[in-house]
A protein has these predicted regions:
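Conserved beta-strand hairpin/beta-sheet module of binuclear metal-dependent hydrolase folds
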Residues: 2-7, 12-94, 197-208
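Short, P/G- and charge-enriched loop/turn segments at secondary-structure junctions
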Residues: 37-42, 123-124, 185
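Conserved G/P- and acidic residue-centered "switch" motifs that form tight phosphate/ATP-binding loops
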Residues: 64, 109, 191
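Short active-site segment of divalent metal-dependent hydrolases/proteases
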Residues: 67, 112, 194
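A short secondary-structure junction signal
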Residues: 73-74, 117-119, 146-150, 197-198
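Metallo-beta-lactamase
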Residues: 83-97, 101-113, 129-187, 192
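Metal-dependent catalytic neighborhoods of phosphoester/phosphodiester hydrolases
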Residues: 115-125
Length: 208
């Protein structure tokens, strides 16, 4: 997809599963099972982790990073993740890009399926997957992710983002703001507190 000077592509960083009832809420299983997926023996449904790659001029940025591959064997089994396929690096290769080519990442929020690919584990160390990238997240959301409620604690893995903060790579935004000319963020409350929606516009066509 092209929006003025911006070229927007979808990255495929793998599939994972979550409980179908949690995903569809008050919608009866009889309806979502027929329309989407019947669920496996544990009532889990497949979901895709698909960040966006945005390119213009000499800039290359991502919106979210997918799951990553830091999962323990136990968590990989719970979420049905094939760690050999859940890779941001492999997804970037499809566009002839390397991790060091990425200039910035706008994080809609810090749930593991959106920020997990931002870091990787080498031995006992957590290091950035994208060594030259600056990361952007809402200030209120970062505070929430550091001290989540019992309800959504399981969706935040601090190895995904705390090392970015410690290394000075994670920049917080307080409310609406333009990150690059034509690319801005708008805070929203969705399935977690203080997420941000990304707006890409050339002055005529707009993508949210």
């Amino acid at each position: 997809m092209n929006i003025g000077k911006f070229k927007v592509d979808v990255l495929d960083t793998g599939v994972f599963t979550l409980d179908g009832g949690s995903m569809f809420g008050v919608v009866p299983k009889a309806l979502w099972a027929k329309a989407y997926h019947p669920g496996d023996e544990l009532n889990r449904i497949p979901l895709s982790a698909r960040p966006l790659l945005v390119r213009w001029d000499d800039k290359k940025i991502l919106i979210d990073t997918g799951n990553g591959d830091k999962f323990s064997d136990k968590l990989a089994n719970i979420y049905s993740i094939d760690k050999t396929k859940s890779s941001l690096e492999v997804a970037l290769k499809q566009f002839d890009l390397k991790p060091e080519d990425i200039d910035a990442v706008i994080l809609t929020h810090l749930h593991f399926d959106h920020v997990g690919g931002a870091t990787k584990k080498i031995g006992d160390k957590i290091i950035p997957t994208l060594p030259n990238a600056k990361f952007y997240v809402q200030k209120d959301h970062l505070n929430w992710a550091k001290n989540p409620t019992e309800k959504d604690r399981a969706s935040f893995f601090k190895d995904d983002f705390m090392s970015l903060l410690a290394d000075g790579l994670l920049e917080t935004i307080d409310g609406e703001g333009e990150i690059f000319q034509g690319i801005s963020v708008i805070p929203v409350n969705g399935h977690t507190k203080s997420m941000q929606t990304v707006k890409i516009t050339d002055g005529g066509t707009t993508l949210y």
